[in-house]
Amino acid sequence: MTATLTSLNFEHLIVTDPKILADIRNVYATTHYGPEDAEFLKTPGGQQDLDFNTFIRYNQSVRNGLPWVQRVFDMTGKTLIEIGCGTGSSTAAFAYLAKHIYSCDPKENTLPTARARLEALNLTNIDITSHAAPEFFHYCRQNYCDQADAVLFFAVLEHQTLDERIESLRQAWQILKPGGVIIVIETPSRLTYMDHHTTRLPFYSMLPMDVALRYVEHSSRGDFVGSMLKARSEPLAVQEELMIRWGRGISYHEFDLAFPDGGYTIIADGYEREMTDLFPVTFDERLLQGFVAHNGFNIPPAFLRHTLCLILRKGDGAVPAPQRTYTPHVATKLELERLRDRLDLMSIAEIRGELNRLMDRGVAFGHQSGM
């Protein structure tokens, strides 16, 4: 049953008790970081990380994640498997609705924070273990449940290898009950001009791995650059895995590989209000939509967002799953032509403005000044 709109306000779940927040923050600071990180934690970047893992992501899960899912799939009383719980922000949020959550994370240093959060909020309907996917699905079958109503990947798929990613999606599909859902939240797309997730560099998501490894110094993220440079003397396979663990964008290709026969329906595609509030639609996305529409590619709009937030529903035999089709925002040829004209004018204006700015700064084109 889909939730009614009146049930989509979860503001009462926001944690404001300063003692609870301080306790969670302290556990995270002392278990995720060591004494050598004391100075970093005093910096704006360190404080931001503490805030993010104490309350920001939890608040986002409550205000955006819960109503977004509940709008199309009622989680009340359902069994949820969560892959990659991290510090338990999404775990705690969804625990208010689900009957039981079976959750895992391969990073043991994140689990004390998750457990402290759940204890502080008096949430007892969760089992957390230190496992990686896809192995966790086998563990669930042996120890917890044969089937689940939903599987959650919250900011997880981008940190997996290709094999892990495809097998995790397949295992999730197999353990789902008919009519169950796979929930993907906050996973960066590789089909973007800008890598906002890992390097904050343009076109980085499009680079092949060998070029990406050589180009890390250009990133403005000191922690990322330092980590990657430290591994420069390691075998190439070690460097590649480290890059993946930091996060590499994904696309519809992995879903086509995991589900070659289709069989699913996209019941939420990331253009809903809850997700656009978190991740506003960008000019780059509109360009990609226009490109797909112009060429008639059969790519669902869910995979054209710069940050993927989508819910896949497994067929239950009641209604045949429709073929995956792309319904362009531009419905007619005339509208497409008008969109093209607007994009051309916008692009020309932006390019002209940038050229003027560069010329005002005395930037030479094609060669260095004085050469």
Positions of PLM-derived features:
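Conserved N-terminal segment of class I S-adenosyl-L-methionine
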Residues: 2-146, 150, 154, 166, ...
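Short catalytic/ligand-binding loop motif for oxyanion handling, primarily in non-cytosolic enzymes
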Residues: 89-93, 110, 160, 190-195, ...
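Short conserved AdoMet
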Residues: 95-96, 177, 260
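SAM-dependent methyltransferase
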Residues: 201-253
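Short catalytic micro-motifs in class I SAM-dependent methyltransferases
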Residues: 155-159
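Conserved class I S-adenosyl-L-methionine
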Residues: 183-212
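A C-terminal cap/extension of S-adenosyl-L-methionine-dependent methyltransferases
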Residues: 231-356, 360
